[in-house]
């Protein structure tokens, strides 16, 4: 089931910035305990191995905005690839089209990037696409359709957006290129992907 509540509340519960900018913990939003009646008790307790795996799985799942069913399907795909499993997991997640649209600075969140793709505002290699979960490759080109670039809100955001180092973006042309797979050091440090791998290795055959 996909989580539809407040991303700020979810981030505080997980103790991790799902927006990757710590806005959820900025002054006026941070609280002394995680949401819920027993927040302090759960925060102070030592997590079991199972609970640690669950927490890391949830952090990764909610950050990339995918359901558990989608994650299992993606994990099966990653299991078939050669190389380091944890590295490949992050590479595949980062290579989703909605994530690349976000990394190129075309959308403030992955959720809004998914909406852009769903509504047909994104062109991949000269083809209009509407599937956010498409896995793209280094060298692929992404462009926004003209109708959405006319929005003052979109234009203003893109002009001031931060672009990830593993993509190139031409803000004036509203287009970009996925240059290379990201290094682990360029990705969120607050997730222990080894726990995520252990979680899904039990469930996915």
Curated annotation (Swiss-Prot):
GO CC list: small ribosomal subunit
A Pfam family per the record: Ribosomal_S4
InterPro entries: Ribosomal_uS4 (IPR022801), Ribosomal_uS4_bac-type (IPR005709), Ribosomal_uS4_CS (IPR018079), Ribosomal_uS4_N (IPR001912), S4_RNA-bd (IPR002942), S4_RNA-bd_sf (IPR036986)
The S4 RNA-binding domain, residue ranges: 95-158
Keyword Ribosomal protein on entry: yes
Gene3D superfamilies membership: Ribosomal Protein S4 Delta 41, Chain A, domain 1, RNA-binding S4 domain
A GO molecular function held by the record: rRNA binding
Domain of life according to the entry: Bacteria
Subunit and interaction comment: Part of the 30S ribosomal subunit. Contacts protein S5. The interaction surface between S4 and S5 is involved in control of translational fidelity.
Task performed by this protein: One of the primary rRNA binding proteins, it binds directly to 16S rRNA where it nucleates assembly of the body of the 30S subunit. With S5 and S12 plays an important role in translational accuracy.
Protein name: Small ribosomal subunit protein uS4
Origin species: Mycoplasma genitalium (strain ATCC 33530 / DSM 19775 / NCTC 10195 / G37) (Mycoplasmoides genitalium)
